[in-house]
Each structure stands twice: as structure tokens, then as C-alpha cells.
Amino acid sequence: VPGTSPDQPRNEMAMTTTRSRKALYIGLPLALVAALGAVGYAHWFSQAPGYPRPIVEQANALHEHMLSFDSHVTVPLDLGTAGNEIDKDGPGQFDLVKAGRGRLSGAALTIFGWPEIWNGPNAPHRPTPGFVDEARHQQEVRYKIITGMVRDFPNQVGIAYTPEDFRRLNGEGKFAIFISMLNAYPLGHDLSQLDLWAARGMRMFGFSYTGNNDWADSSRPLPFFNDTADALGGLSPLGEQAVKRLNDLGVIIDVSQMSTLALQDVARLSRAPVVASHSAPRALVDIPRNLSDKEMQLIKDSGGVIQVVGFGQYLKPLGKPVLDKLQALRARFDLQPLQGLANALMPGDAVIAIWPESRFGEYASSLYGILEEEPKATLKHYVDAIDYTVKKVGIDHVGISSDFNDGGGLDGWKDVGEIRNVTAELLTRGYSEADIAKLWAGNFLRVWEQVQKSAHPVALR
């Protein structure tokens, strides 16, 4: 049974209001909202047959007055288009209807730009001068999607520029958008882009994604892009300057997806707490993308928080049937047998640097097709990861993230409408309501407040 700890300086349960009568069911007359709240509860209960009814009812009651925050949801480039409307219960993992059904208070909607090398003419292809322009275009499209949501649905959603905004929006029955950014690649060498994006509302910035960039080494260097592990030895001089600038702007530094050396550099240089917005413990799946115990301790020592991610391949090792198929695939492409899982989950062998684009495309397509055959991880796997992280760093330094729309999703937590299943599993494990409130939002909001207090000056809207 997880331990407890003193309450946060601000009780995140006491500071919220009941949301079942609020206008989170988009486009519906308010007279129907209360009835649809009951429908939503019945729908959710039907999706959670594995939990005893008292646990289900307790989880439901908690989410009527507890703040909840998912720290990593990617904004799809087609969100808001026909068939993917934000105000309809569509095929994606995030929309405002699902958020209302799940009683999710808010989320970090993540703007990132990285040319998808598997798409476009003659794909896949190696970087060209147009890659940076395309990545910046993707950033702009995602930002316009977010601001368009607020423009089109002002009574249902708003942008949280501060923790106080987040609480206020929740009290008004609105979904709170926290704008985050992932991957410094599109910013080139222009440090002033951080000021621009902070002024536009960005409140968390992650240096790294797949592949190294000019600011930091990635935990997943991509040989197809001629990357090598630890090419910069952590942060570049530009990356080091960025740490100070982000601290000055009051923007949270996100260390997920960084190399170990880069994370160590950030922990050494940052005067504010840091966050891993979507990571899992390496002790459960031994890959560089996950956090080692030492890395988790560095985040704790900064005063920060580890937002455990609901990404199945980071939570449980691959089973033998899939591993056998991967070994056969590697033999077909004259690659050495797997030693560990790092190159099982991505095309990371150094020899790929000299492959023709067509050969890489065939291998990558086959690799990811095989990985799709792996049975989904479950909520039990996910809360195992939370348990482990809490044991290592304490309840005050752990939070929750999904990575929806970019690979996240579990058996029992397939979209934002099912977040109460996470709470039900936590209750089953013996977590107290106060500790669940910390995991769902309290810890992250505390860190956000501390980061903004250390700003000089605080970024302005």
C-alpha cells in the first residue's frame, strides 16, 4: 500500500467545484447536461467491469471535485477537420466530449514539429533544407488548432497561462489547455523563438524528440539521420543558454526523451524544478527512452515531477512471439541478433546510416508492423510503473500522462474518456484520495507555481 505524505500547500481537492452540471458536453443545451452526466457515468461504468461497484462509485465521486491533468497529449494536424471535430465524440483519443465524459480538467496539448520521414513524396527520405520549414509549419498548424478551439468554443475551453488560470477555468466548467512544446529542431539556432512562444502561451518546453538536434542529444538518436549516441555530450552551448532563458521566462523544462547526459546537464544548470512530461521507469523496460533510477532522483532533487506515461511498449517488455518475429526480420536484413530492447522498438542500428532510403523504408515499415502485434499493456502495468516510481522518489514527485495521439493508450485507458479507470486502479492499490489528487494534478501544479515564482521576468501573454 503506497505511503502518504503531508498535504500540498494548496489542497487540490478542496479548491475545486463539482463539474457534472458544467457545460463540458459541447453543443448541448444546459438542460440536458445533468441527464447526460448520468449517461456518461453509466457509459463509463460499462467500460470498467473489472472494478467493484464501490470502487467505481468512489472514483466517479473523486472526479466530480478533484482536479485532473494529463501532461502530454499531442495535437493531431487534422484535429478540427471533418470527421475529427473537437466538439464531437470522434475516432481520436482526445476531444472535448471525451474530456467531459472522463471529467478531465485539463491537459498539456503539445505542439511539436518533426517531418514524418515515412510520409510525403519519395518517402522515407533523409533531411533536406526544407525539413526545418516543414517542422515550423507543423508548429503553426498545431498552435492555430489550439487557438481555434478557444475561439470557437469560448464557453467550454480556455488556455491556462498560470496555475490560477487552471483552477479558475475548472471552476467555470471549462477544459483548461496548457500549451507545451516538444522538440527544439524547428527552432534552428534562434534562442529568441523561446521568447516568442512563451509570449504566445507556451508554458513547458522539451528539447528532444526522436533524433538529435542542435540543442540536445536525444535518448533515441536516429542513424538514418546520421545521428550517433551522445554526439554533443549532452547539451550544446545553445542548449545551455536555453536552460537559463526558459528559467527566466517561467517556462517548465521537460526532460523526457533527452539523453542521460543532456538530462544531467539540465538538472545541473536549472534553478527551477524540471519535469519529465511523459516517461516511464527504465527498471521495468530497459531502454534509453525510459528513466533510470538515477535520472528520476535528479528530477526529484530539482523539486520536479515524473509524469508516468501510458505508452504500452515502455511499460512491459515485448513477448516472445513478437521478439521471435523481430529476430527473423533482423536476420533478413543482415542485422545482428537483438541485445536488449532498444533497437527492438525503433530502427536504431548504426549500420542503417549507410542504407539506401528504400531499404530503410522497407525495414522500418516491417518493424512497426510487427510491433503492432504485441498485446496492449493494461492499467495494471501502468499502475505498476506508478508504484515503482512512487517507491523510488515519493508520492510528491509523480504524476500522470497518456501520450495520446502519438502512441499512448492502454487496455482500460484507450482515450481521455476513460481516465476514471486509472483512478479506480489506484484506489484498488490502496492509494488515498489525497495522494490520488497529487498524482492527477496537485504535484504538477505545485511545480508549475515554483517555476513561475523563479522566473525573471515571468513570460507575459
Regions found by a protein language model. Give the residues of each.
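Substrate-binding cleft of carbohydrate-active enzyme catalytic domains
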Residues: 240-255, 261-262, 295-301, 384, ...
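Acidic, glycine-rich loop-and-beta core segments that form the ion-binding/anion-interacting portion
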Residues: 260-303
